[in-house]
Amino acid sequence: MAFDLADRLQTPVFVVTDLDMGMNDWVVDELEWDDSRKFDRGKVLDFEALEKMEEKFGRYHDVDGDGICYRTYPGAHPSKGAYFTRGTSHDEYARYSEDGEINATNLRRLVQKFKTASELVPDPEIILSDKKNCSGVIYYGSTSAAMIEARDMLKEEGIELDLMRVKAFPFNLDVWDFIEKHDYVYVVEQNRDSQMRTLLMAEGGISAEKLRSLVWFNGQPIEANFIAKKIREREPEKI
């Protein structure tokens, strides 16, 4: 998927894991290779497509409204599809320009491209409890196993939780919808600075009061007992 996204969005895609996953043994499903799998190269104009084009090819021209422009491979056509651009401001046809409005148009296109990316990245994994009006929890990475165990522990005590495991950034609409449906949400992180919480506040305009930080950073894998204890201590507040 990372390769497909990189080609479709024409941008680097980072696959990030945490230290626990990188240094310890984990039990996972056996890898199954599919020889019939084809890579999604995204919006590419080949020889036939360039031959049929009546309009001029614009390397930075957003014809579909999703912020992603069509591209060509070197040598795809003897006279069409080639372009030369520079690192400074340019127009939709890769021509150098110092026009402020042209530069602003390019930047607005990139904003739309970022929104499109949020629709293509993996959806979060959401686990809802049977109880309504319960608290929400956001987590990611190797926190998953401890979080599920902590959820089960708290459920036995009558504390129900809705869970959401974030899998990608930029965040899609499911992330914002989950937060919106809860009065407050715990953000469980193995990160001293609670960077996921900060990112959620910055990207979604979420208030600091709504996102409750729960961090673990002693160098060891996070423990279910720790998560359960911290949530148990704060649940009676019921803001």
Spans of model-derived segments:
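Flexible, low-complexity linker and terminal segments
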Residues: 3-239
